[in-house]
């Protein structure tokens, strides 16, 4: 509400709430910090798990940052912005989501301290941008170059990504599976290695133990053979991929046929049979003995295919069809009229197997497959889900390392090194921005501090030891959460992809700067609740932060 010559002037709709200046900044910073604090206890190998129960009573148990943040329902817009940071981190690199969120929360906490000292938000924002730019430069300097053939380092990266996800009993095997999967689908072009992790299918099946998780050099489908008379096992498979139905097409116009003679009805049925027989003959004549169809297969077509000894699967998802094409070298056909043997893919074996209580179709032994499957097993549904999330993180982390050819050590070492270098560099800026750079350097310490806290160690003692080691030039010194000692993480073999750190720092800085620059919140009146929600008039309640 504004005033003109002492008279109130109503500009905003009645019920609209407006918060301005420092109150708006404090409210946004508080909301962001609450979200960061919610996931902070999950960080690191000793991080705790969260049990999430949705409105239907479904339970998710995880310590994966992005999974937690996707499941919780928040109303505050600043909190939603922090959750977007986790989603971006997950989409770009697949790991480091908790790191990004915790760092964003700490950057805002340190910014609030500067605001209390009457430092303008624009100056803090500029200082943070300078610091982030310098931090990425320092990270590149301390990064360790690797090649896609450094299997041991790649396995260590996968192990680091999976640690704390309940996979410890078989972590070496799972790490090897993740590395082999990435190496199988990696492709080189113009001297650059490219890895599209979409072509690594993670199929989950409850039953057995984690040790039974396996890498399949082909595709596993959660489907079964359509007809009992079809073979359940085909060796030296010639595979046809079809994205149209194996059925007689109906006309688009709403036509009716009046049959007056029973013989004509018989001829009509025979004509349909002949058309289906012709379709199957084309498939068989092209040399196909396995058919994967994206749509339906007519009962009669199933019979003819079974009679010809062809294994067929229907209603295959489009994404699986694309993976089958990549794995077997087949082309996805829309029309059988143009079918030839060149369109078929190859696999050493296609068979239906019983996994747990259900049947699945395995396409294995593909020559140089560019799509593979990791079949995850585990005793309970929650275990399988969490192991699958861990493997997905590991696969994405290894893919980043292979593509970039650079890694950094973990355990809080890079954050302390960058923090130290930023403090040395800050005085060269002059002006109040150096205070923001120093605040940025302090904020980075939240990562090793949290790792220590979550392991039950004294964070102050750990930070003092870490800083002392880095002051002496030990740039790979990090905290060993098992012993509480500061050790060389390069020798210990704790590695993370460089991209995980650069993306986390970049995303956290961007969202912190964006939130800092907001000085006015105008919230429209919410939809009215049922009477009793906010007194007699049913006024909407204020959202909780």
Curated annotation (Swiss-Prot):
GO terms for molecular function: ATP binding; ATP hydrolysis activity; ATP-dependent protein folding chaperone; unfolded protein binding. The keyword Plastid does not apply. Keywords: ATP-binding, Chaperone, Nucleotide-binding. CDD domains: cpn60 (cd03343). It holds the Pfam family Cpn60_TCP1. Molecular chaperone; binds unfolded polypeptides in vitro, and has a weak ATPase activity. This is Thermosome subunit beta.
């Amino acid at each position: 509400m504004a005033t003109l010559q002492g008279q109130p002037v109503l500009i905003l709709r009645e019920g609209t709430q407006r918060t301005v200046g420092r109150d708006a900044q404090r409210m946004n910073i508080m909301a962001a910090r609450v979200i960061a604090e919610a996931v902070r206890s999950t960080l690191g190998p000793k991080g705790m798990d969260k049990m999430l129960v949705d409105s239907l009573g479904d339970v998710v148990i995880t310590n994966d940052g992005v999974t937690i943040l996707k499941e919780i329902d928040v109303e505050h817009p600043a909190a939603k912005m922090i959750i977007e940071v986790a989603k971006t981190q997950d989409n770009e690199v697949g790991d480091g989501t908790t790191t990004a969120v915790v760092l964003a929360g700490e950057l805002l906490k340190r910014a609030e301290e500067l605001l209390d000292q009457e430092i303008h938000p624009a100056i803090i924002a500029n200082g943070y941008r300078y610091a982030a730019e310098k931090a990425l430069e320092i990270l590149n300097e301390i990064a360790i170059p690797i090649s896609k053939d450094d299997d041991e380092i790649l396995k260590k990266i996968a192990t680091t990504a999976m640690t704390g996800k309940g996979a410890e009993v078989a972590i070496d095997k799972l790490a090897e599976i993740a590395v082999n999967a990435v190496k199988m689908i990696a492709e080189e072009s113009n001297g650059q290695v490219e890895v599209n992790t979409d072509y690594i299918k993670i199929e989950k099946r409850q039953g057995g133990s984690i040790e039974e998780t396996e890498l399949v050099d082909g595709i596993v489908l959660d489907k079964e053979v359509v007809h009992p008379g079809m073979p359940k096992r085909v060796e030296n498979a010639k595979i046809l991929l079809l994205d149209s139905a194996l059925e007689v097409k109906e006309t688009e116009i709403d036509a009716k046929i009046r049959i007056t003679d029973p013989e004509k009805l018989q001829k009509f049925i025979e004509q349909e049979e002949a058309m289906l027989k012709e379709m199957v003959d084309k498939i068989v004549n092209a040399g196909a003995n396995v058919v994967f169809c994206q749509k339906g297969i007519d009962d009669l077509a199933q019979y003819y295919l079974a009679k010809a000894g062809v294994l067929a699967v229907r209603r295959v998802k489009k994404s699986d069809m694309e993976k089958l094409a990549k794995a077997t070298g087949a082309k996805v056909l829309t029309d059988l009229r143009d079918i030839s043997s060149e369109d078929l893919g190859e696999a050493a074996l296609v068979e239906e197997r019983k996994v747990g209580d259900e049947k699945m179709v395995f396409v294995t032994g593909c020559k140089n497959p560019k799509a593979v499957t990791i079949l995850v097993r585990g005793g309970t549904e929650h275990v399988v889900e969490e192991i699958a999330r861990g493997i997905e993180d590991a696969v994405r982390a290894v893919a980043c390392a292979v593509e970039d050819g650079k890694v950094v050590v973990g355990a809080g070492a890079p954050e302390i090194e960058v923090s130290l270098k930023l403090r040395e560099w800050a005085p060269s800026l002059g002006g109040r921005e150096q205070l923001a750079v120093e605040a940025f350097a302090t904020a980075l310490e939240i990562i090793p501090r949290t790792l220590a806290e979550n392991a039950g160690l004294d964070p102050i003692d750990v930070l003092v030891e870490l800083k002392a080691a880095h002051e002496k030039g030990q740039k790979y010194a990090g905290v060993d959460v098992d012993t509480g000692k500061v050790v060389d993480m390069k020798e210990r073999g704790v590695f993370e992809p460089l991209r995980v750190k650069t993306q986390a720092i970049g995303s956290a800085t961007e969202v912190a700067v964006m939130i800092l620059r907001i000085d006015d919140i105008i919230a429209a009146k919410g939809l009215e609740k049922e009477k009793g929600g906010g007194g007699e008039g049913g006024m909407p309640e204020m959202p909780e932060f």
